[in-house]
């Protein structure tokens, strides 16, 4: 059985588009072949936690990303023992999650971009080069989102 950690850097809420799509995929997966655990910085509603736990998965609440070092090292520790990480994010700032996974020895690092712009353009540009070298597979919710963060090629 493969162990996958899904990290959500945006809000993990039942009515959000990202959560809806992600949970639809999760519900369809064969949980005898793959164990998927979730982590985010917010406290999701009990209805989501109940569904996750009822399916044999775990949820981990991470500290705020604003405390960069504490967040990074806690995530690195959590990543140990997982075969893959799938990070849902909106910018190259997800380099923190990807680098924590690298430091923890995770070989498969999937990034999933959900936006075509960033609120932090300067930081996005600053981290973009390292970010693009930190994932093994890239996914985007649209061509526009993919081209904005990954360039013209190399994403699905």
Regions found by a protein language model. Give the residues of each.
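Membrane-interface segments of envelope glycosyltransferases acting on lipid-linked substrates or membrane lipids
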Residues: 1-156
């Amino acid at each position: 059985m493969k162990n996958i950690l899904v990290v959500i850097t945006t809000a993990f809420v039942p009515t959000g588009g990202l959560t809806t799509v992600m949970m639809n995929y999760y519900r369809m997966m064969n949980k005898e072949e793959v164990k998927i655990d979730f982590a985010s910085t917010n406290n999701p509603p009990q209805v989501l936690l109940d569904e996750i736990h009822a399916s044999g998965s775990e949820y981990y609440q991470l500290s705020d990303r604003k405390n960069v070092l504490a967040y990074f090292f806690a995530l690195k520790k959590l990543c140990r023992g997982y075969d893959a990480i799938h990070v849902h994010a909106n910018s190259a700032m997800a380099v923190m999650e990807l680098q924590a996974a690298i430091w923890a020895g995770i070989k498969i690092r999937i990034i999933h971009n959900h936006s075509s712009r960033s609120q932090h353009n300067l930081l996005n540009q600053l981290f973009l080069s390292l970010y693009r070298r930190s994932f093994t597979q890239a996914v985007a919710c649209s061509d526009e989102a993919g081209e904005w963060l990954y360039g013209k090629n190399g994403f699905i």
